[in-house]
């Protein structure tokens, strides 16, 4: 399951030729496919079948007879209940793999708590170079520097992404909007192919634009966060994130990852809104911007995000905010919890588990009341 049709189609096109060699049927299920009922009928097949899709996989009429493996890509884009729906859509509990470039705070907390085991790919693919991150203010001087970077990359026959938080101008005109920025870039680069992409466009129009970007028929693409996942343009070497203080840390990291996918040197500019500098940004916004330019490491960023946002309800569905833990604080107890998990995984037996629970009940008679948030007086 992937969060966007573009990404689901990309996975289908990659996996279908491989699985065909083993006589495994592969089906793509999204909201726009025409043979939906036929695909759903295949879910009761007794033969090995591979389904790739979007949220269409978790609709009410979708039921798997024998789901053995559930893979969720870009899992930070799905809510807790949505991930649960996929896993519970079969009469057996499937094996699960969740994939993300930046685990959200709740994921970090759950991984520490033992619900998830983590495998880390901490190396760049062969031939790729580290992306350089640059933080620029909204001053006129820095605005001109952004254009200088554009000229430099265009001279190298590279492509550029410019991402804005909104489609239209808001009441605060200093926050960059995609349509306004598109008009500006048309004037600044009249001899270049500048295009606009956003979520209000029809699917066919979006697909056409991305196809042209893929074929290097577009030089500069002005967009909203619709390109956050599933875009693989190897010739794109400059990402400009306008009004960067308006984005979450997770989004900033995902957007940065849209460049640096080829062998050319790539850069990502985090450009603050007009007339703003880092000192005028909110404390939380400042922490996010300083964090994103300090590292390209997704796991380090997730730990920083954990400190900024909190881990959310360990037993509920909130993925950020105050914890429901009464003693531990995963923002500060991360290392000791990590060591505890390693120890318990090695040493825990049913007898030891019973003994620990018994001791805890004696030492903390009001333990269950604490956990339920009841009055323990």
Predicted regions and their residues:
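Conserved nucleic-acid-binding Ia/Ib motif block in the N-terminal RecA-like helicase ATPase lobe
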Residues: 2-51, 55-56, 186, 191-197
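Conserved interdomain linker/interface between the two RecA-like ATPase lobes of SF2 helicase motors
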Residues: 115-182
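Conserved motor-coupling elements within RecA-like helicase/translocase cores
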Residues: 30-51, 58-67, 203-220
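Structural recognition of the conserved hydrophobic beta-strand(s) that form the central parallel beta-sheet
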Residues: 1, 29, 50-54, 71-72, ...
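Loop/turn-to-beta-strand initiation segments
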Residues: 25, 46-50, 66-69, 92-97, ...
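SF2 helicase catalytic motif II
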Residues: 56-98
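C-terminal helicase module of SF1/SF2 nucleic-acid helicases/translocases
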Residues: 141-159, 179-377
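Flexible beta-alpha connector loops of hexameric P-loop NTPases
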Residues: 5-6, 26-35, 71, 76-77, ...
């Amino acid at each position: 399951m992937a969060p966007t049709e573009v990404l689901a189609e990309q996975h289908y096109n990659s996996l279908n030729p491989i699985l065909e060699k083993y006589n495994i049927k592969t089906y793509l299920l999204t909201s726009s496919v025409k043979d939906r009922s036929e695909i759903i009928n295949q879910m009761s097949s007794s033969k090995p079948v591979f389904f790739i899709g979007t949220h269409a996989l978790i609709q009410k009429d979708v039921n798997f007879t024998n789901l053995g493996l559930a893979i969720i890509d870009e899992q930070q884009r799905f809510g807790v209940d949505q991930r649960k729906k996929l896993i519970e859509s079969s009469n057996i509990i499937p094996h699960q793999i969740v994939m993300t470039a930046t685990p959200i705070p709740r994921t970090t907390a759950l991984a520490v708590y033992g619900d998830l085991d983590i495998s880390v790919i901490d190396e760049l693919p062969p031939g790729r170079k580290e992306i350089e991150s640059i933080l620029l203010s909204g001053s006129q001087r820095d605005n001109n520097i952004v254009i200088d970077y554009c000229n430099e990359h265009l001279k190298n026959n590279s492509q550029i992404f410019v991402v804005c938080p909104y489609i239209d101008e808001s009441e605060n005109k200093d926050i960059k909007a995609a349509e306004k920025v598109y008009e500006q870039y048309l004037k600044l680069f009249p001899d270049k192919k500048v295009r606009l992409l956003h979520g209000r466009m029809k699917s066919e129009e979006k697909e056409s634009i991305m196809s042209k970007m893929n074929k290097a028929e577009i030089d500069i693409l002005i967009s909203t966060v619709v390109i956050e996942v599933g875009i693989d343009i190897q010739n794109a070497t400059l990402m400009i994130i306008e009004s960067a203080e308006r984005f979450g840390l997770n989004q900033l990291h995902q957007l940065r990852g849209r460049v640096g996918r080829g062998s050319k040197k790539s850069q990502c500019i985090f450009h603050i809104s007009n007339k703003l500098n880092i000192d005028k940004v909110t404390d939380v916004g400042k922490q996010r911007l300083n964090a994103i330019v300090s590292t390209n490491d997704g796991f380090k960023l997730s730990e920083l995000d954990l400190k900024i946002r909190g881990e959310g309800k360990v037993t509920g569905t909130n993925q950020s905010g105050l914890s429901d833990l009464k003693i531990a604080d995963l923002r500060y107890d991360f290392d000791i919890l990590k060591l505890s998990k390693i120890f318990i995984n090695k040493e825990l037996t049913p007898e030891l588990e019973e003994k620990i629970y018994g001791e805890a009940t004696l030492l903390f008679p009001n333990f269950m009341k604490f956990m339920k948030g009841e009055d323990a007086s």
